């Protein structure tokens, strides 16, 4: 099993460490050539946290947006954390256009406040159990479509969800020692292959 990690900007190295800890091979995807070379070998894709506007621009500049979108729509399992969640959203409240726009949800950017307003908590995540959650200016999922399953909420706000082959979290599971959400994603990848 090999999981690609979008490595244009953001917390990609931390995701690679977690996958390594779980005995799963990962590959950093920095451009279209990387993605096309590895696409047939990929069991899944991680879209890490970072700055979503910058990542969206880089995806467009590298001509990666459409090929990645097509792969996701064709069933490639994807895990978007924080900015990665924003990239997957069909609608972003403060923007006119979405990026990949594959997941039926409306997202509000930076809803968890400024960097100084970032926080840590623990909450139940369906299918995983009670897990630690680190929020860094995290987005909030304002609403989800019919086919989207809400996996976790904090303060009555949606912070994790799944729609078919797409898993998202507003928080950064890669910044804790708890690997269960990554294991949940790996299990999704195994089911698809």
Curated annotation (Swiss-Prot):
Its EC number is 4.3.3.6, 3.5.1.2. L-glutamine binds at residues 50-52, 109, 136-137. InterPro entries: Class_I_gatase-like, PdxT/SNO, PdxT/SNO_CS. GO terms for cellular component: cytosol; glutaminase complex. Keywords: Glutamine amidotransferase, Hydrolase, Lyase, Pyridoxal phosphate. NCBIfam families: PLP_synth_Pdx2. Catalyzes the hydrolysis of glutamine to glutamate and ammonia as part of the biosynthesis of pyridoxal 5'-phosphate. The resulting ammonia molecule is channeled to the active site of PdxS. This is Pyridoxal 5'-phosphate synthase subunit PdxT. It comes from Streptococcus pneumoniae serotype 19F (strain G54).
